[in-house]
A protein has these predicted regions:
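Right-hand nucleic-acid polymerase module
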Residues: 19, 72-73, 90-158
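Phosphate/oxyanion-binding loops and surfaces in catalytic or ligand/nucleic-acid-binding neighborhoods
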Residues: 3, 7, 85, 113
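Short aromatic/hydrophobic-glycine micro-motifs
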Residues: 50-51, 87-88, 109
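Aromatic side chains
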Residues: 37, 54-57, 81, 106-109, ...
Length: 158
């Protein structure tokens, strides 16, 4: 309401957000609203908290640091900020870990220092769909994922 003054637009937002289903996952409006709503958080995390290595897509976030204690303190500050300022909560499935050994699972890929792989589950789903005779659009979608995931051997097997 700070940014939008148009009554019709505000009514539409209220109607969508307050509906029984809430914002549908994957809907373009959901992505835009999440990015818009979390813009203040983005500024706070960088300017006030001094975080330099931070990635976010909608409500999925990754923070990088050499210090686990810094990340734990940051997590505490994030929970407080999101609760008090934006009326949001952090799911309890967050993780703080060293990335050298296991990589970062984010947006369908697992990223390591020297390579990017697609998730194991994604590979399994793709193989299953190929066996069942998936349509062209599904196959091309998966091939697009493989293209960005250092998956030359997997592509050759297929």
């Amino acid at each position: 309401r700070k940014k939008f003054k148009d009554k019709d637009l505000l009514w539409l937002f209220d109607d969508i957000i307050d509906s029984a289903d809430g914002l549908p996952i994957g809907n373009y409006l959901s992505q835009y609203l999440a990015n818009f709503y979390l813009t203040y958080f983005d500024h706070w995390i960088k300017e006030v908290q001094g975080v330099t290595d931070y990635f976010r897509y909608a409500d999925d976030m990754v923070f990088l640091s050499d210090s686990k204690s810094f990340l734990h303190k940051l997590l505490h500050n994030i929970k407080k900020y999101l609760t008090e300022k934006l009326n949001l909560t952090v799911k309890e499935n967050y993780q703080v870990f060293l990335v050298e050994s296991r990589g970062i699972d984010f947006l369908g890929y697992v990223s390591f220092h020297d390579r990017i792989r697609i998730r194991k589950k994604t590979k399994q789903n793709f193989a299953r769909k190929l066996k069942r005779g998936a349509d062209k659009s599904t196959i091309y979608s998966y091939l697009g994922l493989l293209k960005h995931g250092n998956c030359i051997n997997l592509k050759n097997k297929l």
